[in-house]
Every structure is written in structure tokens, then in C-alpha cells.
Amino acid sequence: MKWFCANEEHVFWQEITNNISYMITEGYDHQIIIGTDSQRIGNEAVVVVALCIVSDMPDYERVFFYSKEKRPKFTDLYSRISYETQKSIEIADLLKERTTATLENLNISIHLDVSSNEAKNKTSKYSSSLISLVKAYDYPHVQVKPNSWAASYIADKFTKNDR
């Protein structure tokens, strides 16, 4: 996967994981938030994973990175949101593998682009099963709309640009 920072410059995955490892080793307070969104464009779907870091480490207080892929369009809503959820879990798992941290030290939160409000969103009927899925992968911190800003705002923004 190719990663970019907020100004759309390329950044290497190893640089991201090295900085996270350093932040944890040095004892900086932090939270890592991962969210994924997708957008249908013609016969394709653009899928964006946002990796956000909130920390008290200088120059890393509030940063985010994103990765984008194109794939065939999804055939239905559940396929789309379950794929987005799996992508977020995949990145969280990669962080566990590639950093010196334990799961407790990583402090990961997964943001899902689903709603718990039945009146407002078609995705609400899937929210409890997707939350359970994330928790089954040992990620207990899960947010849904309106609190899932990493997916609903940051990843969403980059599904619409041309990079």
C-alpha cells in the first residue's frame, strides 16, 4: 500500500511505524485512530484508509496518513461496509506486527462508517454486527457515526480527490 500525509506527499509505511514505535517507547501519550470509507465512481470503488494519530509528541500532535486503492465496485451495501471494516482491522493488525508495541500500548480505536441511528442511515442494521467483528479481533475501542470522524470525514474527503 502506498501512504500519503495530509499535504498529499508520499510517506513510507516504515517511517509511520518507526515514529509510532518511538512515540510509545518514549512514553508519549497517544491515540491511534483508523477509519475507512469508500466511494463508487463508475464501475470502480475508491477505498481510503485513514490512519490518524493524536499525541503529545512534538511535531506529531495531530497528524494523519491515508492510503487509497481502486477496486471493482461493490455489489451491495453490506459488502461495502464489511470490506471497509476489514481494511481498518488489516491496518491495525499491520501496526501490531510492525511496531515494538503491545496491543495495550498501541491504544487503537477503529472508526466505522456506519450509524447506530436507524432513522438516519441504512447502515444502522449492520452496526452491531460490525462492532462485534472489530471487538472479536481484539480491538475494544470502536466508534460509529456521529463519532467516527476518521472514517466519516478524513477518509471520506480523500475518496473524492484524484490522487
Summary of predicted features, one role per range:
Residues 112-147:
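Short, low-complexity, polybasic intrinsically disordered segments
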Residues 34-35, 39-64:
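Acidic, metal-ligating active-site segments
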Residues 43-47, 119-127, 153-156:
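A short acidic (Asp/Glu
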Residues 143-163:
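C-terminal functional segments of enzyme domains
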Residues 1-40, 104:
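Basic, amphipathic N-terminal segments that precede the first structured/catalytic domain
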Residues 33-36, 109-115:
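Short glycine-rich or small-residue beta-strand-to-loop segments that form or flank ligand, phosphate
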Residues 75, 136, 160:
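Catalytic phosphate/metal-binding cores of nucleic-acid and nucleotide-processing enzymes, i.e., regions
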Residues 70-106:
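Acidic helix/loop or adjacent segment enriched in Glu/Asp that either coordinates divalent metal
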